[in-house]
Amino acid sequence: MTQVKYRLQVAGDSWWKQNINCLAACPVHTDVPGYISRIAEGKFEEAFDLNRKANVFPAILGRICMHPCEKACRRRYLDEAVAICALKRAAADHKPDGGDGARVPLVAGKTRRLAVVGAGPAGLTVADDLARAGFRVTVFEALPVAGGMLNVGIPPYRLARG
């Protein structure tokens, strides 16, 4: 009689990120299956909040993202890829406050003050993270508007202003 041995491996976060193609392809590792399932249930606000955990600007990226997740989507082998980027946009568009909302509760203030130079996506993201960690943050920007290349490099027909 042949003895067969099996090895059980519990899938952790790193396994999921490596083996779910859309998750592995996303530069910020957004929980794509998680927010799509919430949209399917009609829970747009939960989908938006889940998306915002990995990405401070889901309403913007739902419009301009290069969506490498769609190129990696396994569904394309059956018919066509899931419209992941459009679903991200839908979650933001259906959010009652229009896509603005707290990602995590603010922590009690710390006395240390920090400055962030540049109000582009990276500067605003780090300022958001630091403020939510309780630091007092001031953002400096040379341009007359915040947003960096989002505001001055992307045409208004692609990303609406105001």
Language model region names:
Residues 1-113:
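Ferredoxin-type iron-sulfur electron-transfer modules and their immediate structural context
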Residues 29-41, 48-51, 55, 77, ...:
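Beta1-alpha1 glycine-rich phosphate/pyrophosphate-binding loop at the start
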Residues 115-117:
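Conserved beta-strand elements of the Class I
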